[in-house]
From Swiss-Prot:
Catalysed reaction, written as an equation: RNA(n+1) + phosphate = RNA(n) + a ribonucleoside 5'-diphosphate
Gene Ontology molecular function: 3'-5'-RNA exonuclease activity; magnesium ion binding; polyribonucleotide nucleotidyltransferase activity; RNA binding
Domain S1 motif: 623-691
Name of protein: Polyribonucleotide nucleotidyltransferase
Assigned protein family: Belongs to the polyribonucleotide nucleotidyltransferase family.
Top-level taxon of the source organism: Bacteria
HAMAP family: PNPase
Top-tier EC class: transferase
Summary of the function given for this chain in its UniProt record: Involved in mRNA degradation. Catalyzes the phosphorolysis of single-stranded polyribonucleotides processively in the 3'- to 5'-direction.
Keyword entries, A-Z: Cytoplasm, Magnesium, Metal-binding, Nucleotidyltransferase, RNA-binding, Transferase
Amino acid sequence: MFANPVVKSFQYGNHTVTLETGVIARQATAAVMASMDDTSVFVSVVAKKEAVPGQDFFPLTVNYQERTYAAGKIPGGFFKREGRPSEAETLTARLIDRPIRPLFPDAFKNEVQVIATVVSINPEVNPDMITMIGTSAALAIAGIPFNGPIGAARVGHINGELVLNPSNTELENSKLDLVVSGTEGAVLMVESEADNLTEEEMLSAVVFGHEQQQVVINAINEFAAEVATPAWDWVAPEENTVLNARIAELAEAKLVEAYQITEKMTRYDRIHEIAAEVNEVLVSENEDVNLKEVHTIFHDLEKTVVRRSIIAGNPRIDGREKDMVRALDVRTGVLPRTHGSSLFTRGETQALVTATLGTQRDAQIIDSLMGEKKDHFLLHYNFPPYCVGETGFVGSPKRREIGHGKLAKRGIQAVMPSIEEFPYTVRVVSEITESNGSSSMASVCGTSLALMDAGVPIKASVAGIAMGLVKEGDDFVVLSDILGDEDHLGDMDFKVAGTNEGITALQMDIKIEGITKEIMQIALNQAQGARKHILKVMDEAISGAREEISEFAPRIHTMKISSDKIKDVIGKGGAVIRALCEETGTTIEIEDDGTIKIAATEGAAAKEAIRRIEEITAEVEVGKIYTGKVMRIVDFGAFVTVLGPKEGLVHISQIAEERIEKVADHLQVGQEVKTKVLEIDRQGRIRLSIKEANAELNPAPAAEAKDAE
């Protein structure tokens, strides 16, 4: 039934990788089942044979989805099925998209959709690497124009050694989590989180990962040769040299002048005017001119003008030299009621960042295929349309916002205190209020400042910088602190975050081949100088965490009780702890080892909660007098509380000196009385006496007189 199934297996580090096609999803343009040990991902590629007429962009979509059946689970929630992509799924989709997008020809505008579905999971093998490998293999056998294949590798740094594709357990002890992807001859994408590694160590890891993934690239080439899919009969449309020359004649000199304007919005207005003038002239010359084609050529001309100027050694768009950082303005404590806040401005990029402290109950529970975990540090990045002077839809975060937030979090994670050192859940929100390049790195700087303002004892200040590259032939220029235009028109986006000691995060997206190790070394060294300059300015504003957290933040007080007393503090059905929280206005969390954390905005409330817990957990002593409340009245006596919720029985004979007929004549429910503990039997039942407590506290006058005689 299955005509030509093709299977390719190879060893990749400590893992066995298998690529298989020809059995599943045979109506797709290409489909591959990719496995790394017991982690399997099914990848399909569908490409439309024709592009939409007049379409001026490349509609590539990458969908990554994790199925819970892969881990032998049933989804939680009411609907019992997978819903919208999680944050982790979105980040993995971006990880796949970034290295493959630049490998499609610029003129190829046919719609392409990649769908990757995790169908089996080994908790020790993260599915992202095999997904990237499977995607590369599927594109390689699809027959569509694609300048691949790519490889992918995860690199760890454990005990001073670089480790290829470490397991999830090994990653827990690694100072580095780096993903690198590229073709046979070039690195295209790097995504990493590090614990203050040096520039040399980071570069070595990138080179190591690229060298190791050559095994993958060779295997995919052999796999594609065996499948032998015919290549599409697609030829890039011929360049319209006449229109190119006419637009250059009309606009080139004006664009050179426009790019001397240093203020972003004024420059944009002038460029739009030039574009409108060009359109007007061309339409007057030919009513049938394709304005979308004109727009594309005009944009390419802009790119040429800017790149030529930079390569020639001229000042950049905003007048800076290649290694200059824009003017900085750093402020902390800008919002009165937040727990911590900062306003970080770098040129025309600005981030308003807040830090909020919560209890461990506020931690985010992440239920992934590889198990459940709690995240006590949250960082959310928002990019509203007004930050670039535009109108637009405001709603749930887009892929870009999720990706930028994750990058900023990676940059800060290495300096965050452990939950034992600082028992708070911390949420940071970065609102980008102005943007002209490098807003994610502004978020890193703003986050570091806001955390210190909130009193979070981070280990060191962290700053981030975005680097760019313009390369023409053998000539190249590395740019520090790139503008949005330089990012868009350049060949590389290279973001580095770190402390004065080393790098904490590195993200790199390269649009061209030929980026050598030497170029990356220059970029890293130049980024180090820029990072240290920013850190110096930040340290002048605030150089360490404030000694006291905000008066509006909850104070967390920790106490320890015996684990066998936990049930007493919780009470039947949680009644005791619920009453404690409500009556004292605190939040109380109890751990299995007996550690209790009490969160309160007022010290008096915390003290009262501690007093009551101590009372509940204290041992009742025979012969001691306690104050309690009458809880129930029965014919033979009354039940009275001792040390919080504990109850003891006051027999009717122990209520008063004289004989009484009815308990209700002497006691009422809710009445506060003092009792003396007479006995605690083997079953823990407590026998109390009001009579003896009164006798001890208020000796009779007759007895006193007798003693005097």
